[in-house]
Amino acid sequence: EIFLYREQHMGLFFRKNTNICDINKLNFKLFDKNIYTLFQENIRKLNNLLHDYNNIAIYGSGAHGNTIITFIDNSEKIKKCFDLDIRKQGMYLQNSSIIIQEPNIENFKDLEAIIIAAPLYEEEIIRSLREKGYKGDIIATEKELKII
């Protein structure tokens, strides 16, 4: 069973089946060309959105945040990462020199855009960024790539 939150994948749970199944009758889909194409289109769109920015941050140091930097054409434009988890603050995104910081007005200085890399919490993050005084562009990623 798959349980969704805001149409996002939250987890995959398996239920033990006491009936013996024939492995040859199970219908697995290992690769979907359409998903690959859509992914590539979104990477192109993200790079187009980021083209004119020079000082960018990523909000979210989990799997999305660590992965997104590998797909950005000019990753040197990513100056910092934000995360509320104090255990991560002061650390770095994997294989990078991008430091993870507390999201506050002091750390927002000189930033032109923040990419939300925590889609399940996007609405709360956007609201929090604005409440904390961030005035630059926010790039939303939950349902579609767009500048807010």
Task: Show where each model-derived region lies.
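Hydrophobic, well-ordered beta-alpha structural blocks that scaffold small-molecule cofactor pockets
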Residues: I2-I148
